[in-house]
Structure formats: structure tokens, C-alpha cells
Amino acid sequence: MNSVKDPVQLALQTWGSGHALPGVLYHDAALYEREIQRIFFRSWLYVGHQSQIPRRGDYLLFEIAGESVIVVRQDEGEGQIGAMLNVCRHRGSKLCDTATGHEARFVCRYHGWTYGLDGTLRGASQMPEGFDRSRHSLRRLQCRVFAGLIFINFAADAAAFELLSDDMAAPLAPYGLEHTKIAHRQNYPIASNWKLAVENYCECYHCGPAHPEYSVGHGRAIPKREWDHLMHEILARAPQVGLTQHHIRRMWLDAGAFGVDRSFERYPLLRGHQSGSRDGARLAPFLGSITGFDGGATDFQLGPTTFGLAYCDHVVLYRFTPRGLRDTDCEITWLVNESAVEGRDYDREQLIWLWHVTTLADKTIIERNQAGVDSRYYEPGPLSPMEDFANHYLRWYVATMSDTAGQTERLRSGGQHG
């Protein structure tokens, strides 16, 4: 007889790989708080694109689980981008209120403490003799910029970001993400636990029934024989248009360290389709060093909750951020060549059409899923082989959140694990 009495730990310890998760894991408030600490505050999180803060003093805010982070351009041009908590070191007042802005320095409007763009305390009037300003800088977070994308980590002992960036540099290089700009960015609030949103993204078993707009042009659900034939064609064509072939799957339990998940996988578009558009036609100028279409698209992952879809002419980024036990933000960013001009080189409504309608459908699916797993009579069912990627994610999640004797601290830490 199992001696574990905590229903959450019992569910984690008795879960069987290849099955959906038990319902309690989607609606236990204490578990949700532990997820924030164990997963989100120890992972590398995508917070924005460098083009959002081009000038010295430009900043954006990233908020998660009650924490607000200032991400600021500290030097001009290609200079340093840093991240710090949006909390005054005097009595804790919030420094910045607007989602984006520009400041020559950060001034607390409560008692006037003033900070430089690097977070150092520059001024604090009428403090007693012996007050050491150097000990009261804003708390800095680890921050890295890779391929134009900005990442932060709350953990002081976070895993080396280079584990992610070194693996992904060559595969992403042809797309020139550092030379893109944001054509559109939109948030899709989903009334569900964050795990259901990520699970849904990690499988395409539902694509045929739920996403006809996607399925008409993408080869994720076609028979293996047809898949293999189309893949052979794009593998032959890719070098001719400036694309190299890589296959990376170092995520979840195979990441080598916590919070540096990365993957890169090409797959075929169906014949007659060049991009993720309504009619399969080109949507925007080619990205980076790409000179033509090879008939394929790319799925990639950067960290545990950021995913991307790269076409030859644009990139779509998905970021999932928990906002509460049953609330998740799905933010989508569409990137195009930095030289592209809206109205001349691309039509914004056509550019976003596919993943806008697909995400609206996903929102309905996921919210319906949440309602079902909340039922006291819900029982986890078996997964399809087409949900293998999602199953890898579930195995990692259960291992991360279990409090068993065999669950080592190294798995939860920033350091490497076996």
C-alpha cells in the first residue's frame, strides 16, 4: 500500500509514462506555486527582441508570478542589454509602470532614490553617515542576447546559457534573427493551467481534426511514406537556397542541464506551399542568407516554454507564461526581415492569418480541456504515438516536481544532470 498521503505527490509517483496527467496536477494551488519556483525561476525565459529597445535607455517590462523585470538597453547600438528587478531597494516601490518606455535613469517616485541604467544606486538624499550606496543597487538578473532574442534567468546558479546558444547558433544562422524586426505581436489569454497550453503545443495529433487551415499546407500528419519522400526533396533542395540541415533534440530530461531546452527540426510543407500563408504563397522578403524556398519549415524550441516556427520568409515565436493557476498568456511574435516595409513587402493581416486562426482554435480546445480535467470523474487516458513529444515533456515535468528519494537536487538545480 502506498504510504504517500499528499494527493499531489501520490499522483506524481503513480503516473505512468504514455498517459495524460491526473487532474489534481492541473488544479492544486500549492503545486502551482512550487512550479513557479522549480521551473520558471530556474529556467532561461525569452522576454523580447532586441529591436524593441534599440536606443540607450529604452526598456521593456517582463512580468511573471508577481515579479516585474526591467529589461533595458544600457549602451547605444550593439551595446549591453541588462535586466533587473523593478523594485526600489529602499522600501520596495515599483520604479516603472508602463510596459515599454525610455529613461535616462530610473527614479523612484516615492522617496527619490535614483539608479543608473545598470542598476547602480546614484542618489539617495538625507541618508545617515556611513550609508553605502554600492550595497543597494537594483537586483540584477542574468541576461543574455542570442540571435537578437533576449533571455533572462532569476537563478544565481542558472545553467550556462551557452549550452543552448552554442547548439542553436548554426541551425538558426541562415534565418538572421538578429536582423529581423517585429511585424506584429499579440497576446492570447487562455483560461487554463499553463501545462495544458504547453502540452497542446507539443503535439500535432489534434491538428487534423482541429486545424484545417494548418493541415492543408503542413506535413505534420501525413503518412510516413509521403513524409519521407517530401523530406528527401527538401533535404536535396535546402543547400541550394542557403539552408543547412540540423536535427537537435536536447530538451526535457535530455537537455543536459535545467532550463536550457533546445530543439531544431525541419519538416515538409505540402506541394504547392512555400510558406505559412492562406494560399501557400510567399508572404515577405527572404530572411537572412536564404535565397529561395526549399519546400520546408522548421520547428524549434528555446527554453522550456518558448517555441518557434521558421519559414524562409518569416518566423513565428510562441511564449507561454503562467498568470495564475487557471490562466496562461500565449504571446505570439511575428518576425520579418528588418528591411521589409509593411504595405509594400508584406501585408500584416495576411502574415498573421494562419497562426492567429490556429491559436484562437487552440484557445477553445485548451479551455475545453481544462473544464474536463477539473471533473472529479476524469481519468487520464493513453497517449497516441503522435503525442510522443508531449510525453517527453510530461516525463520531465513529473521528474522535476516529484519529491521522491530518487529525485536528485541536481535535476532541479541550474547545474548539469545526467
Which functions belong to the PLM regions below?
Residues D6-G23, E178:
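Short, contiguous pre-domain boundary segments
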Residues L21, L25-I64, V69:
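Non-catalytic accessory segments flanking enzyme active sites
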Residues F40-W44, S93, H206:
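Generic structural signal for secondary-structure transition and capping sites
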Residues F41-P54, R122-Q126, D299-P304:
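Short Pro/Gly-enriched beta-strand edge/turn motifs at strand-loop
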Residues V47, L95, L121, Y214, ...:
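Short clusters of hydrophobic/aromatic residues that line enzyme substrate/ligand-binding pockets
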Residues Q52-P174:
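Rieske [2Fe-2S] iron-sulfur-binding domain
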Residues V72-E76, Q80, N86, R144, ...:
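C-terminal catalytic domain of Rieske-type non-heme iron oxygenases
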